[in-house]
Regions:
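Pocket-flanking alpha-helical
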Residues: 236
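Non-catalytic accessory regions flanking glycosidase/transglycosidase catalytic cores in CAZymes
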Residues: 1-232, 240-247, 270-271, 275-299, ...
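Active-site His/acidic residue clusters
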Residues: 252-266, 310-313
Length: 320
């Protein structure tokens, strides 16, 4: 990339009035990891119900998948999709969302103050991932859930044995394991908005036990520790405590300021988060004598600057 006016003989004032940039597509700076192009869906507002999933709609197929939304998502060529949360997951019990939809119990959505029908559950999510050709990334409930529930979920998704939950998956119409590789160890467990909030020491102790047990259930699982913004004391303590047990460490960055320049400069905040997190990961791996440090899962980010009604539903246009 080069400045088009460089060396043109124009004055600085002239250049400032009509700046331009030339991009050379033949100039390669490096290989881009395809998992940069990931997505995240949560049971929040119209994201799932009334968004990508709407039973009985003329716009939906017989599974309830909105065909118009699928057609918009396919060209994005997403690589991985995270579900079911987000804050929602800390009160989500996956067994409510499998089996005949008519028999699934409705539950209170404590994160967002609504009622969850549970009609879009594990099998629907896996089917949606298959439609898009993306890898599923499941976040586990470390708020109100327990280790046994998590292990059962891994078994349901990935076991080829003749065990209870693998057989239940088969009874629900899915003979072969789904092969879900990516599993998040909770969501934002540091926050007082989270059901079952933990401090960093509590989280490390709990996540250590979960990580070891999950690897016994599925040695191929890739585990993601719950991070904050990449430079917090939480991140440092969690990374130090879980290095060697997890494959990735998550960070979440949102910009939500009504101030224009705060939002314009927010990419610097993201760059700083990535840089700080990478340093903490490398430091922890070096101190433990681990040759390969965990990688970064930047699995939540966005810009909100118009929404003020508490719904978190932003309305973007071409100005953005």
């Amino acid at each position: 990339m080069s400045l088009a006016n460089a060396g043109s003989g124009k004055s600085l004032d002239d250049k400032a009035k009509s700046p331009s940039v030339v991009v050379d597509p033949a100039q390669r700076l490096g290989q881009l990891n395809r998992f940069v192009f990931g997505g995240f869906v949560e049971h929040l507002g119209r994201c799932i119900d009334g968004g990508l999933f709407e039973e009985g709609s003329p716009l939906s197929d017989n599974r309830g998948f909105r065909l118009d939304v699928l057609e918009l998502l396919r060209p994005l060529k997403l690589s991985v999709l995270r579900w079911p949360g987000g804050n929602f997951v800390s009160n989500y019990h996956w067994t409510d969302g499998v089996g005949p939809q008519s028999a699934r119990p409705a539950r209170p959505n404590l994160a967002w103050g609504s009622v969850e029908s549970n009609h879009f559950g594990t099998d629907e999510f896996m089917g949606y991932c298959a439609e898009l050709g993306v890898a599923p990334y499941i976040c586990l409930n470390m708020g109100s859930g327990d280790l046994a529930e998590a292990l059962d979920w891994v078994e349901y998704c990935n076991s080829s044995a003749a065990t209870y939950w693998a057989q239940e998956r088969r009874r629900n119409g899915h003979q072969e394991p789904y092969g879900a590789v990516y599993w998040g160890l909770g969501n934002e467990m540091y926050g007082d908005w989270q059901v079952g909030q933990l401090d960093a020491a509590e989280y490390v102790a709990l996540a250590s036990r979960w990580a070891k047990a999950i690897r016994r259930t599925d040695p191929n699982a890739k585990l993601v520790s719950c991070g904050q913004n990449g430079w917090s004391d939480w991140d440092r303590e969690v990374i130090d405590g879980l290095v060697g047990l997890v494959d990735l460490h998550s960070i979440h960055i949102y910009s939500g300021s009504p101030e224009y320049w705060t939002d314009v400069l927010s990419p610097h905040q993201a760059e700083r988060a990535i840089s700080y997190t990478a340093t903490l990961l490398a430091r922890a791996a070096y101190n433990r004598g681990i040759s390969v440090a965990p990688r970064i899962a930047y699995d939540e980010w966005n810009v909100w600057y118009r929404t003020s009604d508490g719904t978190l539903e932003e309305r973007y246009d071409f100005n953005d």
